[in-house]
Amino acid sequence: WEETLLILPRGGKPSILVGNEGIGYIAVSPVEMNIEFYQTFSLMGQPNDARSRRLEEILKDAIALQSGKLGVIGFKSYDPALHTIGAFVTDVPHYIIQTLERIVPAQLLKNATDLLADCEYGLKHHVSAKEIVLYELTGTRVSRGVLNCLQKLRPGMSELEASRNCLFDGAAANMHPNINFGDKNLSLGLASPTDAKRLQLGELVGAGFGKRGCLVHKIGMYVE
């Protein structure tokens, strides 16, 4: 529901900035960190008062850098050659970048998202044996749910009715269900199931959903 900013120094204790909701959750973390209450990360309409320091003041205390590089991690990496705004391209909110540039030289900022998310060497591709087992288990459960949904399709059934056959449970999801009938609904790409659309013979059918570690989606034509 709100943003969080983690600052990892080369040496010393990490710092984390959390909003109104995060301040209640951070206490359960086993990692020793400097916790900073920063209400600007909270939802609009929630309290944002004098209990929070200004961002520049917080970052000055947490960052001491005059040489080397300061890695900024957002959602994606970008090839500077494809842009016209210089070597540093990031999707981290502009007000955070502007504040950082008041503390450290702008030329020291670098998009470091690739360290986590690069498709070849990013940390997300280095998984433990336990994680491999969990992903395999999740893949089996999701694929069986999609298969069960397809096997129980009947003419006149709504997309919403069909979605109930996906064997959902409370495991963490990475996307909403996509159960769609007919050219129009399938063409929407990632549409949620509706109660209005009813299945007819000869129609295209798409069925899929995802849980943490796996996503399965199948498309075919419904025939007897």
Describe the role of every protein-language-model region:
Residues W1-E3, K13, L65-K69, G202:
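A general structural motif
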Residues L5, Y95-T99, G202:
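Acidic, His- and aromatic-enriched active-site or binding-groove loops in soluble protein domains
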Residues W1-R53, K197:
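N-terminal accessory/capping or targeting/presequence segment of soluble
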Residues L43, P47-M175:
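Flexible, acidic/His-enriched mid-domain "rim/lid" segments that flank
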Residues W1, V104, K110-H126, M157-E224:
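Short catalytic-site patches enriched in acidic/histidine residues
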Residues L8-R10, V18-N20, G74, F181, ...:
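Pocket-edge structural micro-motifs
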Residues P14-S15, I23-Y25, Y78-D79, R212-L215:
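Short, acidic Gly/Pro/Ser/Thr-rich loop/turn segments
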